């Protein structure tokens, strides 16, 4: 966000809490999908960027978070090892939750990653509506195409509900309208 000269950009804490809040408000308590646990998803979102507090916010491709996650994993291993010291809470549960997010192998991890992506695209849309001249059209296409990287049905539903169908983001989609008209002429 700083590259686009956004004044007072979202902090890591604000991003984490916003993602957590999206999940709290919009995810169902139960789902027929085997292994689904809203609590585990919420825990994953609570710790998913914990290492960024130490290593800093990193610019990554949302569809290929592997490098960022690997770097964070090393930091978190050290942090959670401190839970083995006397008089320090055992953080093994949260390390296991983060490892689940890192590996992305179950429905909860995939849902948490989808929520993380949706929250980030939502933030882009908010910033675009405030600072439209800070973003080229290619940014709009790039951010909106992140929908293709979602992994869960609930992720697609929430993306549509919170972004695509959000009337407050009409400016984002309107910025692409002239291009669409040109494409129809060809």
Regions found by a protein language model. Name each.
Residues 1-186:
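Alpha-helical, largely C-terminal catalytic domains
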């Amino acid at each position: 966000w700083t590259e686009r000269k956004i004044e007072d950009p979202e902090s890591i804490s604000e991003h984490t809490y916003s993602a957590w809040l999206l999940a709290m408000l919009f995810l169902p308590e139960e789902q027929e999908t085997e292994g689904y646990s809203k609590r585990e998803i919420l825990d994953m979102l609570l710790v998913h960027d914990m290492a960024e507090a130490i290593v800093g916010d990193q610019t990554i491709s949302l569809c290929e978070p592997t490098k960022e996650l690997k770097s964070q994993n090393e930091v978190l291993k050290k942090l959670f090892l401190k839970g083995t010291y006397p008089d320090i809470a055992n953080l093994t549960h949260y390390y296991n939750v983060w490892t689940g997010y890192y590996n992305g192998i179950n429905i909860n991890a995939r849902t948490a990653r989808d929520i993380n992506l949706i929250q980030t695209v939502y933030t882009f849309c908010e910033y675009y509506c405030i600072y439209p001249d800070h973003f080229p059209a290619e940014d709009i296409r790039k951010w909106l195409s992140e929908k293709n990287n979602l992994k869960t049905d609930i992720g697609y539903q929430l993306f549509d509900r919170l972004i695509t169908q959000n009337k407050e983001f009409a400016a984002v989609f309107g910025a692409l309208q002239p291009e669409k008209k040109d494409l129809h002429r060809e």
